[in-house]
């Protein structure tokens, strides 16, 4: 279901607060980042005491099964597995939901059609940020599925008119392999960071005005100082958009 007008799951101090649904664990390290950013922003926006926290529910499935079906090209199965988690979110009272992972948005059409909740797509807040900052040509680092697929590149190009450059050859291999062999397991190695810096530099040499960190684990490894152009982290953009959505009525 496309994201629509904000509803209201409950009243807090006479204000409407929506419950955020998160399909996480894909992989678990970045789900922690979502949880931290969302709660920090809610605490910041709802009061000076810093004790407010988000209304949210989290569901996840076994990442090994997700990864195996990705590798086998069974995106329909990925969609089924994640849609099951979406149903759990709805039953738990979520008002809308997000996928805390870029790559599984490859199956977004399966999931969005199967889950009876508004869906906050990761690409849209990322594109909004890129456009607001005046970028027209952007580089992309992500899993191989993300860099060669259509859900992110196609959406940025067709819906938002952005030109997208993706890592190629050795750089694409290094980034993809690091994701599944290290980052998804919570391992962040200096040598791998250097490979990412080289991939970023290559994108900049081809004309990238900014580089999208198009995997929710990448921001745990790469830092702003690793790039000569701005880095746009999809995790941050997505988490901020979730809070914006949840608190829309509260802050009117």
Spans of model-derived segments:
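Non-catalytic structural scaffold of enzyme domains
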Residues: 3, 8-252
């Amino acid at each position: 279901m496309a994201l629509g007008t904000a509803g209201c799951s409950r009243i807090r101090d006479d204000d409407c607060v929506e419950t955020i649904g998160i399909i996480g664990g894909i992989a678990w390290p970045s789900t922690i980042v979502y949880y931290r950013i969302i709660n920090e922003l809610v605490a910041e926006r709802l009061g000076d005491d810093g004790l407010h926290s988000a209304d949210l529910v989290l569901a996840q499935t076994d990442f090994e099964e997700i990864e195996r079906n990705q590798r086998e090209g069974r995106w329909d199965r990925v969609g089924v597995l994640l849609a099951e988690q979406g149903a759990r979110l709805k039953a738990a009272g979520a008002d809308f939901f997000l996928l805390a992972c870029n790559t599984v948005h490859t199956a977004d059409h399966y999931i969005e059609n199967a889950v009876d909740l508004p869906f906050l797509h990761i690409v849209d807040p990322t594109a909004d940020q890129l456009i607001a900052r005046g970028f027209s040509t952007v580089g992309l680092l992500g899993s191989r599925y993300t860099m060669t697929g259509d859900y992110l590149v196609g959406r940025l190009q067709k819906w938002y008119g952005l030109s997208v450059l993706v890592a190629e050859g050795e750089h694409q291999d290094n980034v993809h392999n690091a994701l599944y062999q290290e980052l998804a397991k919570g391992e962040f190695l200096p040598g791998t960071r250097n490979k990412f810096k080289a991939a970023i530099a290559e994108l900049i040499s081809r004309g990238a005005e900014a580089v999208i960190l198009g995997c929710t684990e990448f921001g745990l490894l790469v830092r702003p100082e690793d790039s000569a152009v701005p880095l746009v982290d999809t995790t941050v953009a997505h988490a901020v958009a979730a809070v914006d959505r949840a608190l829309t009525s509260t802050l009117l």
